Amino acid sequence: MRDRPFYLPRNGEMKLQFFHVSDLCRFITILMDKHPVQHLFNLGNPEIVTVKEWVTLCYEAVGKLPTFVSVDQTHHQRDYFCFYDYEYVLDVSKQSSLMPVTLSLKEGLREEYVWYKDHPESVYNRKPYLEYIERHISVKL
């Protein structure tokens, strides 16, 4: 794994919320077992992080420390970064009333890294983010 700086949109302040697939499966099982009156739930980990915090956790999962390069708005965020330029934070209190414990983002990222490392043939990069960065915004550190 090469050491690369991370090209951070807008100083990394946008908020993100994730949900591990194992928690989704557990929640579906809870719904089937409990048959709650409510049928609509916002699902997500109650842990809200900024892009910068998320990237730091991703790097930690692989035993690295990130170096950040801020990217200004002259570049469209989706050309070099996987998330759209908007944030959302869901109220997951109703989910939490049925399932109070979820996998931490840090642990989920660690598990996913191990899986991806063991299954490189399953990794498919849909967008050429690195190519865009190298051609249009790369800086020498």
Report the location of each language-model feature.
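Conserved C-terminal active-site "lid" loop/helix of NAD(P)H-dependent oxidoreductases
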Residues: V21, H75-T102, E107-E111, E121, ...
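Residues at helix-coil transition
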Residues: M1-R2, D33, G63, V114-D118
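Amphipathic terminal alpha-helices
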Residues: L105-L141
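Structured loop/turn residues at secondary-structure junctions
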Residues: N11-E13, P46, P100
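Alpha-helical substrate-binding/gating segment
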Residues: M1-Y7, K15-N42, I48
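Non-catalytic, hydrophobic alpha-helical segments
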Residues: L24, I28, L43, W54, ...
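Short linear capping/connector segments at secondary-structure termini
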Residues: P9-M14, Q73-Q77
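Mid/C-terminal beta-alpha module of Rossmann-like enzyme folds, strongest
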Residues: L31-Y80, K140-L141
